[in-house]
């Protein structure tokens, strides 16, 4: 009886050692694009138009809105899906509501080259930037709407300025490095 239990215990131990155990401590930065606004005084939605048609889980829209969107997001999804960019950039089904006090961030697999497209629900109009690039892991762009009339409808051109916080990003990098190192040392 004891012999069977010892053999069973050894078999379980052997199986446990044979199966790999993975430890993940990836706290590093992820490529992202943040869109900040200034002078925006009405409801607005934003997306990034990408050169590619697929980036990771992001792809071209189908005939119907995907299930992960909330019903109140449907008008914005339809407006972005209907927009035809003259330079061939594509809507990849990422969108967010944006305001001066709450920037929008595409934080997972953001495109490398893109345009920022805004949609104004009240007028149905758009505002679009020139082609931009993700110049850093946490690229930040600020768009000033002081000279833009969202009620005008149609497509207006806006300018996006880089607004990168070098000090804050350096501090964040140091903190992530320390946390990753601490977790790796605890696991090892």
Model-derived segments and their meaning:
Residues 60-108:
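Tryptophan-paired
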Residues 112-120:
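A short, solvent-exposed beta-strand micro-motif common in secreted/extracellular proteins
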Residues 130-172:
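Short, aromatic-rich amphipathic segments at membrane interfaces
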Residues 29-38:
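A short, amphipathic beta-strand motif
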Residues 19-29:
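Sec-dependent signal peptide cleavage junction
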